[in-house]
């Protein structure tokens, strides 16, 4: 279930932050558009449990959506997934679907949501297949 905005951040606060940071840097570097997403490993999926990971992903992805809506000519939204060390990929599939419905064009898939413990199977393992199947079906719709 989607969570409400956390914390309550106004559009003006988002604009101010983006214009003094990301947009300023883009202009300084001569770029006019960027893929906008959190780094999967920096989102600390190994902290907390699956429910924490889901809420954290929803809140972050909702903020990314807002940024992309405020500056659609600059930010292309890419989502983070609620990966958690002991969770299967169902939560990630559900969040991917939610984000695709919001207009996201991609996602960050963390091959090691265990935070450096490498407890997950390699990306070629069947564990990942349900996610790949969903991703492929989405790609075919585009």
Task: Write out the residue ranges for each language-model feature.
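Helix-coil boundary/capping segments in enzymes
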Residues: 1-142
């Amino acid at each position: 279930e989607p969570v409400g905005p956390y914390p309550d951040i106004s559009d003006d606060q988002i604009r101010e932050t983006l214009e003094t940071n990301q947009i300023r840097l883009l202009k300084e570097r001569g770029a006019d558009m960027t893929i906008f997403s959190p780094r999967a490993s920096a989102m600390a999926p190994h902290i907390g449990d699956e429910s924490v990971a889901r809420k954290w992903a929803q809140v972050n992805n909702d903020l990314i959506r807002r940024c992309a809506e405020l500056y659609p000519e600059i930010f292309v939204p890419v989502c983070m997934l609620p990966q958690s060390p002991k969770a299967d990929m169902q939560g990630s599939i559900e969040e991917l679907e939610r984000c695709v419905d919001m207009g996201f064009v991609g996602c960050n898939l963390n091959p090691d949501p265990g935070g450096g413990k490498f407890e997950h199977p390699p990306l070629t393992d069947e564990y990942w297949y349900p996610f790949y199947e969903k991703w492929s079906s989405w790609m075919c719709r585009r």
